[in-house]
Structure formats: C-alpha cells, structure tokens
Regions:
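Short, Lys/Arg-rich flexible segments
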Residues: 1-163
Length: 163
C-alpha cells in the first residue's frame, strides 16, 4: 500500500487479554485478523460513503464545492473509497489505500509546483494560478468507537467458537 495506512496500538486491557487468549488458544489467528481487517474496511468505506465520521473535517473551498458531483467531502468518483483494503497476518492487521493522493487528505499538507513556476488548475468556472495550495488534514483512516466494538466482538466470537 503506497498511499497511506493506519497502525493502532492497543491500550485497552480487555482487548489485550483477549488477543493473548486468542494467540494461546489458536495456533492460526489469521482468520481473526482477516475478519477484523474486513470489518474495518467496511466501516471506513461506509463512513466515507455516508460522509459520517466522528471527525469534524474543515469545509471545502466554496468554489470547489460548487463543482463537485458528490456532496461528501472525500468522495468524488469513489476511487478512494473503493481502494481501501486490508492485509492481515497472525499478529497484525493493516488497513490502508494504494492511492498516492490519500496521504494529503489523511495528514494535510501543502502542494507546490514541482516542474513549473506555479500550479495551474480549474476551479469553479475559471482557472487558478498559484504557487501553492494547502490541503487541510481530513483523516479518514481512523479507529472509532464502533471499530473498537467490532474488534472486541470479533475476538470474543472467535474465542467462544474455539471453546
């Protein structure tokens, strides 16, 4: 995943105990990790599609907003949402995207012209020429309360099925 990924350190003692229990109970925890990854991908895609998140994102530039086909901030063609994927191993789950532009949305930053004196792009009904554009951070690869519940539910379900 060349775009952006999230890593989460688990601090919740119940979840840590459940993972330790899981690893001692199961020799192969890959199915659990894959289920967690699949659940996280689904939640992130749904939040992107609905434009619903606990994160309050900065509003769009009004001129740009007027030209958007989709009312949700990080959705235009659906390519970003469709690119969210997971990788899982026996002791990890990685969720991310291979879209290079995802990083600027996740972390924010300033875009400057690389091979020209200025950036030149269409905005609204006209064109803009500027030295730089600052994109505010709009984190979409996040772990929210519903994700924490999902992770715990999956782990506990797998543990119950092993007993």
């Amino acid at each position: 995943m060349a775009g952006v990924t999230i890593e989460v350190k688990v601090d919740d003692e119940d979840v840590k105990r459940a993972f330790a229990n899981l690893q001692s109970t199961m020799k192969n925890t890959m199915p659990v990790m894959q289920a967690i990854g699949t659940g996280l991908v689904g939640n992130i895609q749904r939040r992107l599609g609905n434009g619903v998140s606990s994160n309050v994102w900065p509003p769009l530039n009004p001129a740009y907003k007027a030209t958007k086909r989709n009312k949700n901030i990080l959705v235009e063609s659906g390519a970003l949402r469709g690119s969210i994927s997971e990788q899982a191993g026996n002791d990890f789950v990685r969720v991310g995207t291979n879209k290079i532009y995802a990083a600027i949305h996740q972390f924010g930053g300033t875009i400057t012209a690389k091979n020209a004196p200025a950036l030149f792009f269409r905005l609204g009904s006209g064109f803009v020429r500027t030295k730089s554009v600052t994109i505010p951070a709009r984190p979409f690869l996040t772990i929210e309360d519903e994700d924490e519940r999902l992770i715990a539910d999956i782990i506990f379900r797998f543990l119950q099925n092993k007993q």
